[in-house]
Amino acid sequence: MKHRISTMVLLGGTLAALSFSSLPAQDAPNPKAAQKLARALEGRTPGKPVACIANLRGSAKMSVVDDWTILFRDGGTIYVQKPKGGCPKLSRGQYALVKRQVGGSQYCEGDIGEVVDPVSGFFAGNCVFGPFVPYRKVG
C-alpha cells in the first residue's frame, strides 16, 4: 500500500511539473517585444489602471506587441492591455482579435477576446482581458 501511494504521489508531482513547464514564460518577454513596447511608451508615464475603455474601431487604434501585450490608442493616451494568460497566436500577424459583444461599446476587464483567422473565420484561441493601464505624455 505504501509503495502504491508513493508511486501515485510521484506520478502526480511529475504530471504537475510537466504541465507547469509547458506554460509560456510570461515574465520573460522576448527582447524585440520589450523594445517595441519601450518605443511605444517612450516619454509617457503610467496612470491608475481602469476597468474599461471605449471600443476603438479600426486597425490603426490597436497594435499587438506580442501574445502578452496589446496597445490601444485613444487620442494621446495609450492603454496597455496584458491579457490574463496571454493571447495565443495573436502576434503572428495573420490573425485578428474579435470581441463578441451584445450591446455596449467598451472593452472591459474580464471580457473574452477571440483570435480568429480573418480569411477563413476559423477560431485560433482566446484571451481574457485584464485591467487597462493608461500611459500619457509627460508635460
Model segments located where?
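Bacterial N-terminal signal peptides that target proteins for export
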Residues: M1-L10
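Bacterial N-terminal signal peptides
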Residues: V9-S19
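N-terminal secretory signal peptides
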Residues: L23-I78
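Disulfide-bonded cysteine motifs in exported proteins
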Residues: G47, Q81-K82, G103, F122
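A short macromolecule-binding patch
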Residues: I78-G86
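Helix-rich interaction surfaces within compact, conserved domain-sized segments
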Residues: P88-G139
